[in-house]
């Protein structure tokens, strides 16, 4: 069995090669990048592989995304239409994502930013927290990671509501689905956490009309994909005070350009796409287990429905 690793970062290619060689000692694992000679492989693992991989390396039976999300592959016109695409499921990312979102929700609920302002002004004043029962936290996207985040926040006593394309039932979470229930979902979100996959249906979803359905003074947290948001509309909502703040971990262009207004906006908090970093060792174990199942002719989870984009 031959496994090819394609990743834009050399360090990641080396890590994946080392892990997969250890986990599947009978396999030949090799790295490939544009410009390398043609070859053959049974399985491919990578990130932003580019059309050249599928032209140069023949025999690939399935492609495994080496990070969260598969839009980097679905947006590649050279990706073979009949090649199975398999996504990572958690692989150590759910805990990181939950911690990131919990931190932001706690900061917002307990008004930490206002206390920091008061410190700079030498003001000693206790602030009354809002009633927790009315402090709705919405998680938009209830896949493996979204469901984990919703459950973690619910466990801390926040009233959590979740939204998904298809109906879901999750204990302790008020679940909404479909276009008809979206307005009611948004209306109850004092904090809205975006965890949607990037698809044709979700690209530029979060614009002026969408944001206007959130309660006045709501906060937005985006840990999914930057292209979900129309940036000018978000800035307008922040400038007007319609939104109280936004925490952004992902952007339409990364790294974020130095002159972008997000950098210095007083109502924006920025992190450099670190809400859930791919843990190669855990991810490789998951991929290796799935390859072993495929070799035995057994079904695997995480197979992407390309018509839906996830």
Which residues are covered by each model-predicted region?
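N-terminal glycine-/charge-rich "phosphate-binding" loop or analogous flexible N-terminal tail
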Residues: 1-41
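C-terminal helix-to-coil terminal segments
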Residues: 84-97, 114-115, 169, 254-310
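Short acidic low-complexity segments
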Residues: 28-40, 51-54, 173-188
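Phosphate/diphosphate ligand-binding glycine-rich loop within oxidoreductases
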Residues: 42-116
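NAD(P)-binding Rossmann-fold cofactor-contacting core
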Residues: 156-172
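Glycine-rich, N-terminal phosphate-binding loop of Rossmann-like dinucleotide-binding domains
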Residues: 48, 67, 194-196, 223-224, ...
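Glycine-rich NAD(P)-binding loop of Rossmann-like domains
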Residues: 115-148
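Rossmann-like adenosine-cofactor binding region
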Residues: 167-261
């Amino acid at each position: 069995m031959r496994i090819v690793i394609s990743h834009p970062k050399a360090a990641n290619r080396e890590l994946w090669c080392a892990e997969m060689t250890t986990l599947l000692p009978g396999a030949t694992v090799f790295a490939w990048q544009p410009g390398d000679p043609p070859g053959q492989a049974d399985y491919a693992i990578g990130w932003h592989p580019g059309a050249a991989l599928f032209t140069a390396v023949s025999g690939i039976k399935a492609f495994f995304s080496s990070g969260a999300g598969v839009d980097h592959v679905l947006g590649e016109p050279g990706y073979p239409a009949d090649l199975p695409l398999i996504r990572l499921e958690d692989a150590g990312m759910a805990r990181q994502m939950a911690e990131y979102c919990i931190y932001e929700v706690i900061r917002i609920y307990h008004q930490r930013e206002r206390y920091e302002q008061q410190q700079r002004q030498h003001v000693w004043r206790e602030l009354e927290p809002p009633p927790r029962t009315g402090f709705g936290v919405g998680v938009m996207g209830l896949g493996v990671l979204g469901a984990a985040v919703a459950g973690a926040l619910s466990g801390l006593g926040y009233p959590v509501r979740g939204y998904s394309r298809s109906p879901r039932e999750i204990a302790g979470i008020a679940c909404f689905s479909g276009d008809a229930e979206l307005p009611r979902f948004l209306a109850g979100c004092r904090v809205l956490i975006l965890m949607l996959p990037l698809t044709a249906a979700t690209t530029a979803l979060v614009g002026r009309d969408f944001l206007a359905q959130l309660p006045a003074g709501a906060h937005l947290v985006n840990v999914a994909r930057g292209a979900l948001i129309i940036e000018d509309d978000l800035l307008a909502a922040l400038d007007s005070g319609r939104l109280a703040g936004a925490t952004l971990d992902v952007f339409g262009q990364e790294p974020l350009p130095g002159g972008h207004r997000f950098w210095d906006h007083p109502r924006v908090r920025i992190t450099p796409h670190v809400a859930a970093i791919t843990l190669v060792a855990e991810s490789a174990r998951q991929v290796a287990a799935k390859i072993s199942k495929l070799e035995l002719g057994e079904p695997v989870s995480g197979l992407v429905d390309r018509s839906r984009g996830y």
